[in-house]
């Protein structure tokens, strides 16, 4: 039977629509398969990311749990403290002020050969290297029968204890915990006026006596109530610490006062007149101060001692090797208040030039490529022992600026022509004992807890 024109048009349209529908159906099936593949890939990616995240969490938890168990089970007083790292502030400032390109281009400029040698700094630089070398270990202690809390810097380079007084009218004191003698029943008046000078300024006040508490230890102790801290600005206002607890030597103190640890031993509160620092490798912003004894779970291998060569500082004799550059019988100061290894400028400039290390102009950053195979293991030789510091301990990648670039935790500081400071990088690798009775410093490789 023949179709009419309208019926034929309808039939053709139906066939075309059916064909189009088949193509659409086929296309949808293909899209569905692609979607399923993508969903499967997303699932795999999610599982991988989640797995890595949980692996990190579990590993971190296990690591912290081991450390927690050591601290929980130790028979010695151990105080956790925070570490205020000046390099963190420098890098934060670089990012905040959008100087990342400036850092990268500075390195490229001096590497390109346009300059005769890498820029190693000058006295006109806008940020003092001494400022970025300053490190703060600060933990909590209390004063008085009512346990007034204070955040102390634990400082091996000074010997007095001071806190701001309620009578302090300096700008910085307005944000601090202030000592109120009238609130403590164990307060004893002294009133002798005193001032202490630091590299960053002078504080003024008067002597008082009250009960000092550190962890589960307490003792009556003569300290300084500070009434004027203006000279410490702007550092004081911008930092979390309230006062300083000196862990140096008596001859370094104002008023000829025994250090807290020595006084604790005299009062039979601890077994030994010593303290130790343990700085975990996995977390550069915390550390642990132990008073009166040595916790063997913080280190591995032998614990070796070096006799002091100075009656004011924790200073020892070492032959120091920076690759081919050697300083015989150098004075090495072991210092909790220094964020880097420091060396005399004339010694360090030669080393940096050979190692293709440059200083970023107007910033306290010494930079090289992270794959710089020329960087040596630093060696520190005593008469009977050798201590080493591999590049991984004295350099860190500038991840937020350029992952290919690393900064060095080595700075030029001129105390004299043969004095080095072994600060945070050295003490992070080596568990360190400061022993008043042996007049020695002890080192052992720190465990990675």
UniProtKB/Swiss-Prot annotation:
- Cysteine pairs forming cystine bridges in this chain are 168-173, 370-406
Which intervals lie on the Cytoplasmic side per UniProt?
Answer: 1-37
Query: According to its UniProt record, where is this protein located?
Result: Membrane; Vacuole lumen
GO annotation (BP), single = acquisition of nutrients from host
Question: What are the GO cellular component annotations?
Answer: food vacuole; membrane; vacuolar lumen
Task: Explain the post-translational modification.
Answer: Proteolytically cleaved into the soluble active mature form by cysteine proteases in the digestive vacuole of trophozoites. Proteolysis requires an acidic environment. Autoprocessing or transprocessing by other plasmepsins such as PMII may serve as an alternate activation system.
Q: Where is the active site?
A: 155, 335
Q: What does this protein do?
A: During the asexual blood stage, catalyzes the cleavage of denatured host hemoglobin (Hb) or globins. Digestion of host Hb is an essential step which provides the parasite with amino acids for protein synthesis, and regulates osmolarity.
Quaternary assembly: Component of the hemozoin formation complex (HFC) composed of falcipains FP2A and/or FP2B, plasmepsins PMII, PMIII/HAP and PMIV, heme detoxifying protein HDP and falcilysin FLN. The HFC complex is involved in hemoglobin degradation and detoxification of heme in the food vacuole during the asexual blood stage.
Protein family? Belongs to the peptidase A1 family.
- Put simply, this protein is called Plasmepsin IV
The species is Plasmodium falciparum (isolate HB3)
Q: Provide the taxonomic classification.
A: Eukaryota, Sar, Alveolata, Apicomplexa, Aconoidasida
């Amino acid at each position: 039977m023949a179709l009419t024109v309208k019926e034929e048009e309808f039939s053709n349209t139906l066939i075309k629509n059916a064909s189009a529908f088949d193509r659409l159906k086929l296309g949808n099936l293909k899209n569905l398969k692609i979607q399923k593949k993508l969903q499967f890939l997303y699932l795999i990616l999610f599982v991988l990311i989640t797995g890595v995240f949980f692996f990190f969490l579990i590993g971190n938890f296990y690591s912290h749990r081991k450390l927690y168990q050591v601290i929980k089970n130790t028979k010695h007083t151990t105080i956790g403290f925070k570490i205020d790292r000046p390099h963190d502030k420098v890098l934060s400032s670089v990012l905040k002020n959008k100087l990342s390109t400036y850092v990268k281009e500075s390195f490229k400029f001096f590497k390109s050969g346009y300059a005769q040698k890498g820029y190693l700094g000058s006295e006109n630089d806008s940020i003092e290297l001494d400022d970025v070398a300053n490190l703060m270990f600060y933990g909590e202690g209390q004063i008085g029968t009512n346990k007034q809390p204070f955040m102390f810097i634990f400082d091996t380079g000074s010997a007095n204890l001071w806190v701001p007084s309620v009578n302090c009218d300096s700008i910085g004191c307005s944000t601090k915990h202030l000592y109120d003698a009238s609130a403590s029943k164990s307060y004893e008046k002294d009133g002798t006026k005193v001032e202490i000078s630091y590299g960053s300024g002078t504080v003024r006040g008067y002597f008082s006596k009250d009960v000092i508490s550190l962890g589960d230890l307490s003792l009556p102790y003569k300290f300084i109530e500070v009434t004027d801290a203006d000279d410490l600005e702007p550092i004081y206002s911008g930092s979390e610490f309230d006062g300083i607890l000196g862990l140096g030597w008596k001859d370094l103190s104002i008023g000829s006062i025994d250090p807290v640890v020595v006084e604790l031993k005299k009062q039979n509160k601890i077994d030994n007149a010593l303290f130790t620092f343990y700085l975990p490798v996995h977390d550069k912003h915390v550390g642990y101060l132990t008073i009166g004894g040595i916790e063997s779970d913080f280190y591995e291998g032998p614990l070796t001692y070096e006799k002091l060569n100075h009656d004011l500082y924790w200073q020892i004799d070492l032959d120091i090797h920076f690759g081919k550059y050697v300083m015989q019988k150098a004075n090495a100061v072991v210092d909790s208040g220094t964020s880097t290894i420091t060396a005399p400028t004339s010694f360090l400039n030669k080393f940096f030039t050979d190692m293709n290390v440059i200083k970023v102009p107007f910033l306290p950053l010494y930079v090289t490529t992270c794959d710089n195979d020329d960087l040596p293991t630093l060696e520190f030789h005593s008469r009977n022992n050798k201590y080493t510091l591999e590049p991984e301990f004295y350099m860190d990648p500038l991840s937020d600026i350029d992952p290919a670039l690393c900064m060095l935790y080595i700075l030029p500081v001129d105390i004299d022509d043969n004095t080095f400071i072994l600060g945070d990088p050295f003490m992070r690798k080596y568990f360190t004992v400061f022993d008043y009775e042996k007049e020695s410093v002890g080192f052992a490789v720190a465990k990675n807890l």
